Regions:
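Outer-membrane beta-barrel "beta-signal"
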Residues: 173-188
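Extracytoplasmic loops and strand-loop junctions of Gram-negative outer membrane beta-barrel proteins
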Residues: 25-27, 102-106, 161-168
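Transmembrane beta-strand segments of Gram-negative outer membrane beta-barrel proteins
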Residues: 23-32, 92-94, 177
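Membrane-spanning beta-strands of outer-membrane beta-barrel proteins
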Residues: 25, 37, 71, 114-116, ...
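Gram-negative (and chloroplast) outer-membrane scaffold detector with strong preference
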Residues: 46-137, 184-185
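Bacterial N-terminal signal peptides that target proteins for export
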Residues: 1-8
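Sec/Tat signal peptide C-region and signal peptidase I cleavage site
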Residues: 17-23
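Solvent-exposed loop segments that connect transmembrane elements
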Residues: 149-165
Length: 188
């Protein structure tokens, strides 16, 4: 698990190293939809040109919706803004997602990771000079690799090779990658 976390941190670092140092604007945000699901998150977006910005959102929750499901995720994204002022009006985004999850739902245990890519479309309203409200919706492909078993199964015996447990479920989902309402504050 520490290796996966380090990879996620490295991916976020590389994303921001690519952004121009003399960025015109920096924005910090939180997605209200995730907050309502008890998955606190924070994001940082850096404007890189007249029509572009890059950003990353991270979230972590020890109990999504109060269930015993732990979730950590990172979502880097490139956005193209259709207006001549980034972080204003219509945009389309291309991004990725990396997630680690573990928990039990209806006596079935899940433990694994997922990665994916997707496209996002949205609109930003400027409430004040520094405060914005954003609505967005996204769709993409998500690959997962996980251990999946019912409580009481002999998972540790049945799915062990050379002393290491292996995943017994992997595949792809086509699903919404980002749907929500965000509140953002322009720092610079």
């Amino acid at each position: 698990m520490p290796m996966r976390r380090n990879l996620l941190i490295a991916a976020a670092f590389l994303l921001f190293c690519h952004a121009e140092v003399n960025a015109q604007m920096m924005v910090v945000n939180t997605e209200a939809t995730s907050d309502l699901l008890m998955a606190p998150n924070i994001g940082l977006e850096v404007v890189t040109g007249n029509h572009s910005s890059v950003g990353v959102n991270v979230l972590h929750s020890p109990k999504v919706l109060g269930f015993g499901l732990k979730l950590s995720a990172i979502q880097p994204e490139y956005r193209y803004w259709f207006s001549y002022r980034p972080v204003n009006k219509w945009f389309v985004g291309f991004g990725g997602i990396g997630a680690l999850f573990e928990g039990t739902i209806k006596e079935k245990h899940y433990d694994g990771y997922g990665i994916g890519v997707g496209i996002t479309y949205g609109y930003v309203w400027n409430i004040t000079d520094r405060l914005n409200i954003e609505v967005h919706s996204g769709f993409g492909a998500f690959y997962y690799n996980r251990k999946e078993f019912f409580e009481g199964d002999n998972y540790d015996v049945d799915y062990t090779e050379d002393g290491a447990q292996r995943a017994n479920a992997k595949g792809y989902y086509l699903l919404p990658t980002r749907i929500g309402v965000s509140v953002s504050y322009i720092l610079k």
